[in-house]
Amino acid sequence: MNTETFSTPPHTLVIASRESRLAMWQAEHVRCALHKLYPSCDVKILGMTTRGDQILDRTLSKVGGKGLFVKELEAALADGRADLAVHSLKDVPMELPAGFALSTIMEREDPRDALVSNDYDSLAALPAGAVVGTSSLRREAMLRMRYPHLEVRPLRGNLDTRLSKLDRGDYAAIILAAAGLKRLGLGERIRALLDPEDSLPAAGQGALGIEIRADRADLAAWLAPLHHDHTAAAVEAERMVSRALGGSCEVPLAAYATWRDGALHLRGIVATPDGQRVLSAQASAPAPSVERAVALGQEVASALEQQGAMDIVRALSAASGPAAAKQGAAEDGAADSAATGE
């Protein structure tokens, strides 16, 4: 490759994005960052409606999982309508199709789940029988394990729809990703940020990923200043847990890595949807590279396998049918992402 191409600022760039309010915010966030790097570059946003945005009457894990949020964007990359696609990282399948690359992972927003309620300040304050809304199997399993006296019901729709359902009294509380609420200036709706013990975040939650065609080395170089090494190591470790376990979107699976005292600490969970069986494993690595972070993810996945995680994965994948079984490792974040992009 001609390195001179990399040093020449791009003249135009097109960002492919879902058309949801949060997705467009994220695309605009990247557009502004690129404009600061390359003031003379004309950066446009191509808004697109994905199948995942259109299906609102079913849990997405039953009709195709995470891939429903990215296929149309990848088609735009492939045919040249767009140069890059901006994703909430937990929307991105663990294995990308041939010819595509996740070139850039940006600095993470708050990865925690958030309790949104008009009447209660914590999950512990909710009375027996209170209805909590979520379409995330991960969140549902954690709620059923920690608060079996609560009633968990599905919640779909975009962010405004979900909040309106809460406000009209359909739910006593709902659980959403904190990052999406904060990015849209709705942080005041958060009554509590959930401790990982109550709701371990999904792999990649709160992080933005930029996908490009694998043959665009020039574009990868232009995007390199937006890459955040610490976030990349954390989410690569998390995604490796999901990838190694090879579960389907029907499997409540979470992985969350944090940096403390120069070391990366990773925890993973696999559960049954009813919360009756929850397996947990954790490990740490000092100042890991991305390669060591991936190995850390494999270590945690292996520890979960030794506890019987694959029994849960196989049983749930078989019960959900071959379509879900083919989806590859994934927490059920795709269902949440229809609302918040997170």
UniProtKB/Swiss-Prot annotation:
Q: Which domain of life is it from?
A: Bacteria
Q: Give positions of region: Disordered.
A: 323-342
Fetch the InterPro entries from UniProt. Answer: HemC, Porphobilin_deaminase_cofac_BS, Porphobilin_deaminase_N, Porphobilinogen_deaminase_C, Porphobilinogen_deaminase_C_sf
Q: Which UniProt keywords apply?
A: Porphyrin biosynthesis, Transferase
Write out the similarity annotation.
Belongs to the HMBS family.
What is an annotated GO biological process for this record, any one? protoporphyrinogen IX biosynthetic process
What else the UniProt entry mentions is: The porphobilinogen subunits are added to the dipyrromethane group.
Q: What is this protein called?
A: Porphobilinogen deaminase
Q: Which reaction does it catalyse?
A: 4 porphobilinogen + H2O = hydroxymethylbilane + 4 NH4(+)
- Which pathway does the UniProt entry assign to this protein? Porphyrin-containing compound metabolism; protoporphyrin-IX biosynthesis; coproporphyrinogen-III from 5-aminolevulinate: step 2/4
**S-(dipyrrolylmethanemethyl)cysteine PTM sites in chain numbering:** 249
Q: Which PANTHER family does UniProt cross-reference here?
A: PORPHOBILINOGEN DEAMINASE
Assembly, in brief, is: Monomer.
Job of this protein = Tetrapolymerization of the monopyrrole PBG into the hydroxymethylbilane pre-uroporphyrinogen in several discrete steps.
What is one term from the GO cellular component aspect held by the record? Answer: cytoplasm
Question: Mind telling me which CDD domains this protein's record contains?
Answer: PBP2_EcHMBS_like
UniProt GO MF annotations: hydroxymethylbilane synthase activity
For this protein, the Enzyme Commission number is 2.5.1.61
Which metal ions or organic cofactors does this protein require, according to UniProt? dipyrromethane
Cofactor details (free text): Binds 1 dipyrromethane group covalently.
**What is the organism field in this record?**
Paraburkholderia phytofirmans (strain DSM 17436 / LMG 22146 / PsJN) (Burkholderia phytofirmans)
